[in-house]
Amino acid sequence: MLCVNVELQERRYPILIGSGLLQDERSYPIKRGGRVMIVTNPTVAQFYLDTVIYALEKRGCVVDHVLLPDGEKYKTLESLNLIFTALLQGNHGRDTTIIALGGGVIGDVAGFAAASYQRGVRLIQIPTTLLSQVDSSVGGKTAVNHELGKNMIGAFYQPSMVIIDTLTLNTLPKREVNAGLAEVIKYGAILDYEFFEWLEQHIDELVALNPEALQHCISRCCQIKADVVARDETEKGDRALLNLGHTFGHAIETHLGYGNWLHGEAVSTGMMMAAALSEELGDISIADVSRLEKLLARANLPTVSPDTMQPEDYLPHMMRDKKVLSGKLRLVLLKSLGQAYVANDTAHTLVLNAIRRCTQTD
């Protein structure tokens, strides 16, 4: 087992990474008699809910659970309210622990519930997808979507710990594995050139779920994110760099309808648009743009815009992005592979040109 610590100004919490952690009662530091509400969905529940309940009950915990509908389109206030109803009907108090057992949607909604219920209860994240293991479960971002924009209603709320059992990836559909690799590649592109080179050498092993490669990959991603969050917990500075490709990607998700493209798929194409724009601005070389495109393609990820979207469809969605300040579009771009920056008020004509470069042509 590996342990990565997230060091915040006032406290720290561990990220445990290993194989078989869910069935080990020692993974859960909850006192005997402690109340627990597990938030999950039917897809994850069929594989892992009984395992987690059994381990918790061996510790003497009193365990309830609530099932949310599965999918990005259910990352809503309605799903949030299902959690609140279950907590209230079960007479859960401020001393309860909410466990988010699932992917990014479950982690975001359950995390927001933990931040909100009785003004805050303890949260443990147990991410079961590659994307949530390397990204969304770490750092305390919680949110639900609005029909006009992704992640528009939420809070920063840190978990007390994150438990990453790599065995959960064995039941993950290949498409979900590939989507998670988009966030993995992002880390190398923005902050760690050596890791990007490692990915070029080992991406095929990750696609094949090689255990050793996965453990190294997940721990490196978590360490990179932990370091960024420690410097900038609430995204006032460097943490914005973690959003490479996300402004373009969120536009795709919102325009197509949540869930039609997976988040990682949208981020993959968004990263190519950001790289194309970076090259237009004279930053990254065309050779490095090609390296990024080839790596994403080897991970079976899209690198061009959906054929149902026109370049002009992007900007209205992008202007609702949370990074927009005083009506000015702010984008994460690349100086080079391994070095990102935030560009302020990029000309819309250049943005459209970059999107057009990533548009499908027959």
Curated annotation (Swiss-Prot):
UniProt KW Metal-binding keyword: yes
Enzyme class: lyase
Comment on bound cofactor: Binds 1 divalent metal cation per subunit. Can use either Co(2+) or Zn(2+).
Pathway(s) where this gene product acts: Metabolic intermediate biosynthesis; chorismate biosynthesis; chorismate from D-erythrose 4-phosphate and phosphoenolpyruvate: step 2/7
InterPro entries membership: Dehydroquinate_synthase, DHQ_synth_AroB, DHQ_synth_fam, DHQS/DOIS_N, DHQS_C
Binding site for Zn(2+): E183, H246, H263
UniProt GO molecular function: 3-dehydroquinate synthase activity; metal ion binding; nucleotide binding
Catalytic reaction annotation: 7-phospho-2-dehydro-3-deoxy-D-arabino-heptonate = 3-dehydroquinate + phosphate
Regions annotated as coiled coil: none
Taxonomic source organism: Haemophilus influenzae (strain PittEE)
Enzyme Commission designation: 4.2.3.4
The name this protein goes by in its record: 3-dehydroquinate synthase
Location within or outside the cell: Cytoplasm
Keywords annotated in UniProt: Amino-acid biosynthesis, Aromatic amino acid biosynthesis, Cobalt, Cytoplasm, Lyase, Metal-binding, NAD, Nucleotide-binding, Zinc
Listed NCBIfam families: aroB
N-terminal signal peptide: none
Single GO biological process annotation from the record: aromatic amino acid family biosynthetic process
